[in-house]
Regions:
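Long amphipathic alpha-helical coiled-coil segments
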Residues: 28-31, 35, 71-102
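Short, charge-rich amphipathic alpha-helices with coiled-coil/heptad character
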Residues: 1-20
C-alpha cells in the first residue's frame, strides 16, 4: 500500500467518523422522543383505566406496546451507530499504525 493511499484512507475514515457523530446525535434525539412518547402513552392509559393498581399498570403496558416497540427500535439504532463508530475508530487506529510502520521502513 502506498503512503498516499494510507493518507487518503485516513481522511475518508475521519470524515465518516464525523458524520457518525452527527448520526449518533440524531439517533439519541430520536430515542429521547420515543421514550417521552412511551411515558405519555403509559401514563395516559394508566390514568384512564379502571380497576386495581396492578390492573391499571397491566392495561397501561398493553396500550403502550406500540410505543415501547418504537422506543426499543430507537435504542437499537443508537446501539448500531455506536458500534459502527467503534469499528471506524478501530480502522483509523489500524491505518495510523500502518502509516507509522511505513514511515519506519522508509527511514531504513
Amino acid at each position: 500500500m502506498l503512503p498516499s493511499n494510507v493518507i487518503k484512507e485516513l481522511q475518508e475514515l475521519t470524515q465518516t467518523n464525523r458524520k457518525g457523530v452527527d448520526a449518533l446525535f440524531e439517533a439519541e434525539s430520536e430515542l429521547a422522543q420515543k421514550e417521552h412518547d412511551l411515558d405519555l402513552v403509559e401514563a395516559q392509559a394508566f390514568l384512564s383505566a379502571e380497576g386495581t393498581v396492578a390492573d391499571r399498570q397491566a392495561l397501561g403496558r398493553l396500550e403502550a406496546a406500540d410505543a415501547r416497540l418504537q422506543r426499543d427500535l430507537a435504542k437499537a439504532k443508537v446501539n448500531r451507530v455506536r458500534t459502527k463508530l467503534k469499528v471506524i475508530e478501530s480502522e483509523i487506529m489500524a491505518q495510523a499504525t500502518m502509516s507509522k510502520m511505513m514511515q519506519a521502513e522508509m527511514k531504513l
